Amino acid sequence: MLPLPLIANGKGFIRALENDGALAVYAPLEGGYEGRYQRRLRANGYASISLSARGLGDVEAYLMQVHGVRPAHLGKKNIAQEGAVGPIYFAQPIAGYQLENLPAQSKGLVLWILEGYILSQTEIQDLISLTKRVPKLKVVLEMGGDRVFRWQPLLDCLQAA
């Protein structure tokens, strides 16, 4: 009996991610495939973070720099002191903090970004250039659904659009 493609060891996916740094993936809409490939990445020495593309804003600042965020305005304001925009809170960078604290034997950090189809061409280009500048950072961007789990270099996806 031949092994099913679902039980493959994921070597081609990992090799493509290591070569290109950023991949666009298309997964069946019923789900389950993402978790399998994330588990294979972790088994091969990568740390993994899943996040949504919604609300990323400035990709470089959100992922690699300390950045200011404003909480939702709930109708309360201090008329005498501040405007209605509210205070600024500073958040740690999502990827930068994780990269600094990777174990010594780790191969790198993989950002698995959901709903990547909402990102603009410029934001996708920023992700690609970020993986070129930071070699330990890899990006997997979910770009939509398909009947089978497939991937392509994110740069090819950018050129096709």
UniProtKB/Swiss-Prot annotation:
Instruction: Answer yes or no on keyword NAD.
Output: yes
What is the catalytic activity of this protein? a plastoquinone + NADH + (n+1) H(+)(in) = a plastoquinol + NAD(+) + n H(+)(out); a plastoquinone + NADPH + (n+1) H(+)(in) = a plastoquinol + NADP(+) + n H(+)(out)
GO cellular component annotations, sorted alphabetically? plasma membrane-derived thylakoid membrane
Alphabetically sorted, this entry's keywords are: Membrane, NAD, NADP, Plastoquinone, Quinone, Thylakoid, Translocase, Transport
Q: Name one GO molecular function term.
A: quinone binding
Q: According to its record, how does it sit in the membrane?
A: Peripheral membrane protein
Q: State its location(s).
A: Cellular thylakoid membrane
Q: Name the family the entry cites.
A: Belongs to the complex I NdhN subunit family.
Q: What does this protein do?
A: NDH-1 shuttles electrons from an unknown electron donor, via FMN and iron-sulfur (Fe-S) centers, to quinones in the respiratory and/or the photosynthetic chain. The immediate electron acceptor for the enzyme in this species is believed to be plastoquinone. Couples the redox reaction to proton translocation, and thus conserves the redox energy in a proton gradient. Cyanobacterial NDH-1 also plays a role in inorganic carbon-concentration.
Q: How does it assemble?
A: NDH-1 can be composed of about 15 different subunits; different subcomplexes with different compositions have been identified which probably have different functions.
Which protein is depicted? NAD(P)H-quinone oxidoreductase subunit N
**Species annotation:** Synechocystis sp. (strain ATCC 27184 / PCC 6803 / Kazusa)
